[in-house]
C-alpha cells in the first residue's frame, strides 16, 4: 500500500511554507523597491495589499489543498467535479518546472562564490576585480553548468528524502539559521558609522516618491511574495492534517515573509550608507557590490560568507517546492515512487535549464523577443504564468469551490462573526483580487 506524504508537525509546515515564499526577490529586490518608492509609504501600501490580496489568496490555496488532499493537477478537477478545471494545476506545474530551470542557475552561482570565499579564509587565493570575477564565472560554460548541476543535485537529495525527512527537516535547520544570520549581520551593519542614514533611507515615509510603477509593484508583490498562483502553497497544504488552523498558520507565514524583506533592508542599507556604496539590487548586489563592501570591514570575508549562506538558504527553501510539486503531481504523492521521480525530474530540469545557464556566455547572442533565454523564461513565469495562475485560482475558489468545505477548512463556520469574515474573503476573491491582478497584468505592458 502506498504511503501518502504528510507533515510531521505544524511548525515544519509553517517553516517550509515561509521558506517557499522567502526567495531571492525578497532579499535582493524588495528592499530596493521599498527605498526607491517612498520607504515607509511603500511598505504601508504593501502591507495593506498583502492583507487584502496576498493573505486571502494564501488561504484559498490552503483550503483547496487540504480539502482535496491530492496532487495539485488533480485538485481542481476533484473539487470542481470536472477534470476540465485541472488546467489550473497544470499552469502551476509548467511554471515551476521553468522557474527551477533558471532559478538553479543563480543557486549555482551562490555555491561557486561560497567555494571562493571559503578558499580565501584558508588563503587559497584572492579575488581581485569582483565585476571581472562575476563575468568570468557566468560566461564560463563548465563552471555555469557544473554549478547549476550541483544546486539541482542538492534539491534532488532533499526532495527524494520525503516531506518529513527531507523538506521539513531542511526547513527546520535552514529557516532558523536564516533569521540568526540576519540578526548577526543587522547587528554588524547598524554598528557602522552613518548607519542610521541608511535606515532612514530605507524606512522613512516619503509618499512623493511613491510612483504609479511603485504602487503597481507593491500590489503585484503582495501575491508574488507569497509564492501564490503556482499551487506551491496548495501542495504543501495537501500534506496537512485537519487539526492545523489554516488562518493562524497563514498569519505566521505572512509575518515571517514580511519580516525577512524588512530585515534584508536593515542588513544592507546601513552598511552601504557607511561606505557610500550604491546598487540597484539583483545579482550585481550579491556578487559584485557586497563583496566590495565586506572587503572594507574587519573580518569581512566571514560576514560575506554568512550573507552567501543566507542567500543559499533562501534559495534552497524556495527551490525545493518547485521540484516537490511536480514530483507530487507525477507520483500522486506516493512516497514509494518519490526517489526515482526526483532524479528524473531533476535531470529534465537541468537539461531544460542549460540555455539559461549559458545565456551569459556562449548563448549570449541568442534572443527570444529581444531577451536572453534566461530573461525570457523569467518573463514567461513572473509576468505571464504567475498572474494568470493567481487569477484562475481566485476565480475558482470564489465561484466553483463549494462554500461548506471552504468554511470548514478555514474554521469560519462556527459563529456569526466568523461567517461574516468568510463572506468578506469570498467577496475579495470574486471581485477585488481578480480586478487588481488584471490591472497589474495590463500595466506591465504599458
Model regions and ranges:
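Loop-to-transmembrane helix boundary motifs in multi-pass membrane proteins
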Residues: 12-14, 20, 145-146, 256-262, ...
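A generic transmembrane alpha-helix motif of multi-pass inner-membrane proteins
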Residues: 145, 372-395, 418-446
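Helix-loop-helix connectors at the membrane interface of multi-pass transporters/channels
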Residues: 4, 74, 107-138, 239-243, ...
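Membrane-interface "cap" regions at the ends of multi-pass membrane proteins
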Residues: 1-28, 57-62, 66-79, 83-90, ...
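Transmembrane helix-boundary motif of multi-pass solute transporters/channels
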Residues: 12-49, 231-237, 247-251, 255-256, ...
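Inter-helical loop and helix-membrane interface segments of multi-pass membrane transporters/permeases
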Residues: 2-4, 32-37, 70-91, 104-164, ...
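Select transmembrane alpha-helical segments in multipass membrane proteins
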Residues: 6-17, 42-45, 84-97, 146-149, ...
Amino acid at each position: 500500500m502506498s504511503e501518502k506524504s504528510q507533515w510531521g508537525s505544524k511548525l515544519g509546515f509553517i517553516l517550509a511554507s515561509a521558506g517557499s515564499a522567502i526567495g531571492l526577490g525578497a532579499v535582493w529586490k524588495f528592499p530596493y523597491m521599498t527605498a526607491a518608492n517612498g520607504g515607509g509609504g511603500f511598505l504601508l501600501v504593501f502591507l495593506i495589499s498583502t492583507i487584502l490580496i496576498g493573505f486571502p489568496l494564501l488561504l484559498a490555496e490552503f483550503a483547496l489543498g487540504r480539502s482535496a488532499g491530492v496532487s495539485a493537477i488533480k485538485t481542481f478537477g476533484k473539487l470542481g467535479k470536472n477534470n476540465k478545471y485541472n488546467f489550473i494545476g497544470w499552469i502551476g506545474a509548467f511554471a515551476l518546472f521553468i522557474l527551477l530551470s533558471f532559478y538553479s542557475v543563480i543557486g549555482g552561482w551562490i555555491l561557486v562564490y561560497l567555494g571562493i570565499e571559503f578558499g580565501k579564509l584558508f588563503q587559497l587565493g584572492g579575488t581581485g576585480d569582483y565585476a571581472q570575477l562575476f563575468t568570468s564565472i557566468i560566461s564560463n560554460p563548465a563552471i555555469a553548468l557544473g554549478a547549476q548541476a550541483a544546486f539541482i543535485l542538492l534539491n534532488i537529495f532533499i526532495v527524494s528524502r520525503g516531506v518529513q525527512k527531507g523538506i521539513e527537516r531542511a526547513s527546520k535547520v535552514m529557516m532558523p539559521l536564516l533569521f540568526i544570520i540576519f540578526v548577526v549581520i543587522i547587528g554588524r551593519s547598524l554598528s557602522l558609522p552613518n548607519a542610521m542614514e541608511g535606515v532612514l533611507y530605507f524606512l522613512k515615509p516619503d509618499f512623493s516618491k511613491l510612483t504609479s510603477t511603485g504602487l503597481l509593484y507593491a500590489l503585484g508583490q503582495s501575491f508574488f511574495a507569497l509564492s501564490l498562483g503556482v499551487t506551491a502553497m496548495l501542495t504543501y497544504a495537501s500534506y496537512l492534517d485537519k487539526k492545523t488552523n489554516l488562518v493562524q498558520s497563514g498569519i505566521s507565514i505572512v509575518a515571517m515573509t514580511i519580516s525577512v524583506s524588512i530585515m534584508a533592508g536593515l542588513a544592507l542599507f546601513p552598511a552601504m550608507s557607511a561606505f557610500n556604496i550604491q546598487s540597484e539590487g539583483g545579482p550585481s548586489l550579491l556578487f559584485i557590490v557586497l563583496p566590495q563592501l565586506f572587503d572594507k570591514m574587519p573580518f569581512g570575508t566571514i560576514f560575506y560568507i554568512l550573507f552567501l549562506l543566507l542567500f543559499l538558504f533562501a534559495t534552497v527553501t524556495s527551490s525545493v517546492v518547485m521540484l516537490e510539486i511536480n514530483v507530487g503531481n507525477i507520483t500522486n504523492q506516493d512516497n514509494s515512487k518519490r526517489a526515482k521521480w526526483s532524479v528524473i525530474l531533476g535531470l529534465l530540469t537541468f537539461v531544460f535549464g542549460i540555455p539559461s545557464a549559458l545565456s551569459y556566455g556562449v548563448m549570449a547572442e541568442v534572443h527570444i523577443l529581444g531577451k536572453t533565454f534566461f530573461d525570457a523564461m523569467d518573463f514567461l513565469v513572473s509576468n505571464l504564468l504567475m498572474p494568470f495562475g493567481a487569477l484562475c485560482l481566485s476565480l475558482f475558489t470564489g465561484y466553483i469551490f463549494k462554500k461548506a468545505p471552504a468554511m470548514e477548512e478555514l474554521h469560519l463556520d462556527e459563529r456569526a462573526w466568523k461567517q461574516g469574515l468568510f463572506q468578506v474573503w469570498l467577496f475579495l476573491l470574486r471581485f477585488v483580487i481578480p480586478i487588481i491582478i488584471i490591472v497589474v497584468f495590463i500595466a506591465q505592458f504599458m
